[in-house]
Amino acid sequence: MKAIFITLEGPDGSGKTTVGTLLNQKMTEAGIDFIKTREPGGSPISEKVRNIVLGIGNEEMDPKTEVLLIAGARRQHVVETIRPALAVGKTVLCDRFMDSSLAYQGAGRDMDMEQVLQVNLYAIEDTLPDRTYYLDVPAEVGLARIAANKGREVNRLDKEDITYHEKVQAGYEKVINMFPERFMRVDATKTPEEITETILADILRQLA
């Protein structure tokens, strides 16, 4: 069985974390040799950067600072976690990657998406996902889910208004148009179990 680099993307409240947990279980049961990781984070240094970027109280952070910090964390994640796993034949399942920067920092912060892309390509070089699952859910539904989930860890980006989250969604649509060959859109209004089964079936096809 070959190893591939898989990413989960979607707006806040799309259910990515829940689906990622279920996928972890189902992929293990299917006998897939893989690691599960996340961004921002995924390595000791990158997790420290995550705490800075998402920390409540850092609302004054400049948008370009945000882009550069996340790209730096991503670089460390790639060299310390993702590439080593792929090199020994392990599939990588990652909660968010470069596309999140294009949508959240690029579109969400009204920055030039091409510039954000170039910064990230410098950081990751040739380590691009083989398959990206976009969990598609309306912004208002996602924010309602966040509000209803009292046990969820709330970060700085969750506190942005709906206009910001609508910009993020529009940004994702642009990203999908940039890389249509690796994206699969998944209806995230369905149950986490249904979403997981849809994604797992495609993963097994990709690995065949």
Swiss-Prot record:
Keywords: ATP-binding, Kinase, Nucleotide biosynthesis, Nucleotide-binding, Transferase. It is an enzyme of class 2 (transferase). It comes from the Bacteria. Its EC number is 2.7.4.9. ATP binds at G10, P11, D12, G13, S14, G15, K16, T17. GO terms for biological process: dTDP biosynthetic process; dTTP biosynthetic process; dUDP biosynthetic process. One of its GO terms (molecular function) is dTMP kinase activity. It holds the Pfam family Thymidylate_kin. It catalyses: dTMP + ATP = dTDP + ADP. InterPro entries: P-loop_NTPase, Thymidylate_kin-like_dom, Thymidylate_kin_CS, Thymidylate_kinase. One of its GO terms (cellular component) is cytosol. NCBIfam families: DTMP_kinase. Phosphorylation of dTMP to form dTDP in both de novo and salvage pathways of dTTP synthesis. Belongs to the thymidylate kinase family. This is Thymidylate kinase. It comes from Listeria monocytogenes serotype 4a (strain HCC23).
